[in-house]
Design a protein with these regions (language model features):
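Thiamine diphosphate
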Residues: 1-100, 104, 140
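Short, solvent-exposed amphipathic alpha-helical segments in soluble enzyme
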Residues: 9-12, 60-63, 121-126, 151-154
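Short, solvent-exposed polar/charged micro-motifs at secondary-structure junctions
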Residues: 31-32, 118, 146-147
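Histidine (H) residue identity feature
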Residues: 41, 86, 100-103, 113, ...
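A short, terminal or domain-edge coil/loop segment
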Residues: 74-81, 99-104, 127-134, 189-199
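Conserved thiamine diphosphate
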Residues: 86-140, 152, 164-168
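Conformationally flexible catalytic loops at phosphate/diphosphate-handling active centers
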Residues: 134-200
């Protein structure tokens, strides 16, 4: 029940200077947004049920490497491929505990379209603030329902932009050097600094 997200983003993102890329599968989609995030862009992907299962290894990598991204999971009936048109809210524990290892993750659950709108903004803000993947969950009913939505005026919602390093070129860049505000700046791939990203 998530294709409508891709269809709308494919039409609307280019109008706003954004990019939409249709990948060949869920694993490639998750890995593509990790790479795009490392170049300094705000990124998201959307899936449902089994697709969310396929993304788990890459989500774990993004958690470990502290790469901000948003994953939308429009839940459907399961288990396995389940029933694409049947409502379910069965992926909440998977959002929290789905990947191997022990790490924190932020998961938000929406109960109507207004929640989805606001929580999408919140998800991006949280991802950028804490340099972590954020999962936004809602179910098939919300995914297919039509409902009135109040869109705030531009500038009415707080937007957190990525904190970029102020370390000049040719000076050692320490991406995890602590700061008083707790936020960690990032240097964009292809920018002034060369560094490796690993899940180790």
């Amino acid at each position: 029940p998530s294709p409508e997200i891709a269809e709308l983003l494919a039409a609307k993102l280019p109008e706003k200077g954004g990019k939409f890329i249709q990948m060949e599968d869920e694993i490639a989609s998750m890995c593509a947004i990790i790479g795009a995030s490392l170049t300094g862009h705000k990124v998201m992907t959307a899936t449902s049920g089994p697709g969310f299962s396929l993304k788990q290894e890459a989500i774990g990598y993004a958690c470990m490497a502290e790469i901000p991204c948003v994953i939308v999971n429009v839940q459907r009936g399961g288990p396995s491929t389940g029933i694409p048109t049947h409502v379910s809210q069965g992926d909440i524990n998977q959002a929290r505990w789905g990947t191997h290892g022990d790490h924190g993750i932020i998961a938000l659950t929406a109960s109507n379209h207004q929640d989805v709108f606001r929580m999408t903004v919140d998800a991006f803000n949280l991802a950028e603030t804490y340099r972590t993947p954020v999962v936004l969950l809602f179910d098939e009913v919300i995914g297919h329902m039509r409902e009135r939505l109040v869109v705030p005026e531009p500038g009415a919602l707080p937007i957190v932009d990525r904190l970029r390093t102020s370390v000049p070129k040719d000076v050692d860049y320490h991406p995890y050097l602590p700061r008083e505000d707790g936020r960690l700046p990032m240097s964009d791939f292809g920018g002034h600094h060369r560094y490796n990203v690993t899940g180790l």
